[in-house]
Amino acid sequence: MRIFATEVQTINSFVRLESFKEVYGLIWEFLPIFSLVLGILTGVLVLVWLEREISARIQQRIGPEYAGALGILQALADGIKLLFKENLRPSIGNTTLFSIGPSIAVISILLSYSVIPFSNHLVLADFNIGIFLWIAISSIAPIGLLMSGYGSNNKYSFLGGLRAAAQSISYEIPLTLCLLSISLLSNSLSTVDIVEAQSKYGFWGWNLWRQPIGFIIFLISSLAECERLPFDLPEAEEELVAGYQTEYSGIKFGLFYVASYLNLLISSLFVTVLYLGGWNISIPYISILELFERDQIFGTTIGIFITLAKTYLFLFISITTRWTLPRLRIDQLLNFGWKFLLPISLGNLLLTTSFQVFSL
C-alpha cells in the first residue's frame, strides 16, 4: 500500500508540473500582447499630456501642473474620474447599439497596432497583407460611431455619426491609393518589408522623398480619419454639441476619448513606417541591423526610440495644426476629398505604376 501511495503522489506531482508548464506557456504567449497594450496606453498618456502642454504654450497659458510632476498624470486622473462617474443611458433609444458602439471603436483601432514594427524583429504579427489589414480593421471604427449616434436617439448624435461615416469613406479611398503606391515601390504589402526596402538607400531612400505627393495626401487623409481639426466635423461643438458623444458619460465617454488618441497614434506610427524609414537611422555607417546583431537588447531599444521619436514629430505637427487652421464646412470637406485628393492620389498611383513598369 505504501508503494501504491508513493506512485500516486509521483503521478500527481507530474500532473501538477505539466499543468504548471501549460499555464506558464499560456502566460508566455499572451505576454507580448499585454506588453503591447501597456506600451500603447502609456503612449496615449504621454500624447494627452503633450497636447495639453503644447496647446497651453501656443495659447500662452499654463497647462496641467498639479497631477504629478509637470502635470504628466493629468490624463490618468481624468480617466479615474470618468471611471467613477455615473454611466447614463438614453430613456428612448437602442441601448444595445448605444452600449457596444464605443467598444467597437476602441477594439478595431487596438487591433491595428498588431502590424506595426517598432524595431527589427519587434512586431506582433508580420502579415503579408499588413497594410491592407490595417485598412480593413480601421474601416470598422466608423461603424461603431454610426451605431452610437443612431442608438442615442438624438439628432445631434445621429448627425455626428453620419458625418463620421461620410468623412471616413471620403478620405479612406485616397489613403488606400497612397498605400498601393507604397506597396508598388516596395514590392510588398508587409510593413516590415516596406521599412527594410527604405533602408537600402539611407536617408534619401525614405518614401518621403520617393513619394512626396503621396506623403502629403496620406498626411491630410490621416488627419481626416482621426477627426482632428480642421476635419473635426463629426463632433463640431458649435454645430452638434459633441456629435455622436453627446449622450455619453462616464467610462463610455472615456472610451471615445481614448479611441481618438489611439487613432491619432496609430496614424502617426504608419506615417513613420511607410514614409520615414521606420526604425532605421539616417546616420552614415550606423545600421540598426548591425547594432541588433551585436547586441539584440541595445539594437531593439535604439530602434524603438527612433520609431517613437519620428512618431511624436508627426504628432507635434498634428497638435499645432489643431490651433492653426479653421474648421471646414461639411460640403467643403467632402468636395476636398472627392474632387481634389481622390484624382491626385489616383494620378500618383498611375505615375508610380508607370515608373515601376518601365524600370523593369
From Swiss-Prot:
- EC assignment: the record states 7.1.1.-
**BP GO annotations:** aerobic respiration; photosynthesis, light reaction
Q: Please give the superkingdom of this protein's source.
A: Eukaryota
Provide a Gene Ontology MF annotation, just one. Answer: oxidoreductase activity, acting on NAD(P)H, quinone or similar compound as acceptor
Which key words are in the record?
Chloroplast, Membrane, NAD, NADP, Plastid, Plastoquinone, Quinone, Thylakoid, Translocase, Transmembrane, Transmembrane helix
Q: What subcellular locations does the record give?
A: Plastid, Chloroplast thylakoid membrane
- Membrane topology recorded in Swiss-Prot or TrEMBL: Multi-pass membrane protein
**What are the transmembrane regions?**
30-50, 98-118, 127-147, 165-185, 203-223, 248-268, 297-317, 340-360
Quote the catalytic activity from the record: a plastoquinone + NADH + (n+1) H(+)(in) = a plastoquinol + NAD(+) + n H(+)(out); a plastoquinone + NADPH + (n+1) H(+)(in) = a plastoquinol + NADP(+) + n H(+)(out)
Q: Which GO terms describe its cellular component?
A: chloroplast thylakoid membrane
Would the keyword Aminoacyl-tRNA synthetase be found if you checked this record's keyword annotation? no
Q: What is its main location?
A: plastid
Q: What does this protein do?
A: NDH shuttles electrons from NAD(P)H:plastoquinone, via FMN and iron-sulfur (Fe-S) centers, to quinones in the photosynthetic chain and possibly in a chloroplast respiratory chain. The immediate electron acceptor for the enzyme in this species is believed to be plastoquinone. Couples the redox reaction to proton translocation, and thus conserves the redox energy in a proton gradient.
**What is the similarity comment for this entry?**
Belongs to the complex I subunit 1 family.
The annotated subunit structure for this chain is: NDH is composed of at least 16 different subunits, 5 of which are encoded in the nucleus.
NCBIfam families, alphabetized:
PRK06076.1-2 (NF004741)
Q: What is this protein called?
A: NAD(P)H-quinone oxidoreductase subunit 1, chloroplastic
Its taxonomic path starts at: Eukaryota, Viridiplantae, Streptophyta, Embryophyta, Tracheophyta
